[in-house]
Amino acid sequence: IEDNLYDRLASRYTKALARSMSNAKQVKAVEPLIQGLPTTDNFDSGDGVSLFNTSHPTVAGTFQNTLTTQADLNETSLEQSLIDIGQMTDERGLRIAARGVKMIIPSELQFTAERLMKSQGRTGTADNDINAIVSMGMVPQGYRVNNYLTDTDAFYILTDIPNGMKMFNRAPLTTAMEGDFDTGNVRYKARERYSFGVSDPRGIFGVEGT
């Protein structure tokens, strides 16, 4: 430090520490999506069942925010997902006219999603039909790739139901440094507190793929 031998390294390592903190937050953010899938079932919503379930209990019965039969992303599965979203009900069993807003996918599905969401005609068929998903504006905000999703064939649709997925930032990121009396080294640390969860599972629809 005295001869500026490690000045550049110190700057590089503090940036690496910030990058590590950011990466950790992204990994934690997608855990509910990955762990809440039907066969994984390691993340439950407040009603006691997995985040993505065909039988979320209500006062009047149940509602679902996943396909009855899991399927890979294609025209049929996307259309059925949007139909199921539109059939969501509230606690009393009344239709709430929910709509899909944005699709979240892993990087492995970005080319499939581009064809499904941008083609004017139907994909994978010789029929001269329009792409109903595009022409009806069924997913107005399109799709976004999340590179931290580890299930390569799962896809998710955010709905227009408020208070769905939640993040609480309990303590903002802070950094500190101090010198070590014995060695003369300089130590750096970073700390923040946050949590991720769900208030209303109607806010997201998830499909596991096959």
Predicted feature residues:
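Long, contiguous amphipathic alpha-helices that act as assembly "spine/axial" helices in icosahedral shell
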Residues: 1-41, 103, 188-190
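Sequence/fold signature of self-assembling virion shell proteins
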Residues: 49-90, 97-102, 108-210
